[in-house]
Amino acid sequence: MKSSIKYVIVQDYETGGLPSSTKKPFLDVPLCEVACVVVDMEKLEIIDEYQDMFKPNYKEGLVYEPKALEVNGLTLSMLEERGKDAKEVYNNLKQLYLKYKNPRQGAVVCGHNFTGFDHPFTIELFAYHGDDVWKYVKWVEDTQKLAYYANLEQQDYKLATCCADNNIALTGAHRAINDTRSNAQLFISYIKKLRGEGIAVSKEENKPFREQFKFQIPS
């Protein structure tokens, strides 16, 4: 049976702060920028990219933390000049999810620390516009989780460290499209390892289990 996973969308946000128990993603902590990179799961190649900025103050009460903007290099004037209305970005994301949906699993999205940080922003973005992201996205993957599984010990499990350990360049970090391109390559490297690419398999190991198994009677 052939896999029905044709595409994975690697996604990243830049935000104006960090969520907490008192500050909800998107509703209190503003979205500034989104980027997506689409991976063809048969060829393991990047086949499409998307990025947008959000116009600032898309709702009342948003607080843009200076330290957060300093890290990602964005300014409110940049967001005002290049940003789009949150509703337009929501629609663009929805169309991307629909374009690259898989036959059984719908859209599959992935990122680094994506489950804990990024995806809750998507959930609230869609809910704010009267929609449910789970209508389009069925599976959520996380390269940070894959790193924990793949490596029992390393310096840390940040994106930069994981990329460096896998010989993947990460330039212009903390801008959404740059992080996402490198993260897509990291995801591809993990998938290649899962598929055993580049790993030599002996003829004996390649035999079906029935041929390898030899029943022995205890003496």
Which ranges hold each PLM region?
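Active-site flanking residues adjacent to catalytic metal/cofactor-binding acidic residues
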Residues: 11, 141, 178
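Residue-level recognition of the N-termini of beta-strands and the immediately preceding loop/turn
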Residues: 105-108, 136-141
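Active-site metal-coordination segments of metallo-dependent hydrolases
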Residues: 152, 171-177
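Acidic two-metal-ion nuclease catalytic site recognized across multiple nuclease folds
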Residues: 2-3, 165, 181-219
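Substrate-recognition/cap helix-loop segment adjacent to the acidic, metal-dependent catalytic center
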Residues: 117-139
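Short alpha-helix plus adjacent loop in nuclease-associated cores
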Residues: 140-154
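A structural motif
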Residues: 151-164
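Conserved non-catalytic scaffold segment of RNase H-like nuclease domains
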Residues: 2-123, 164, 168, 174
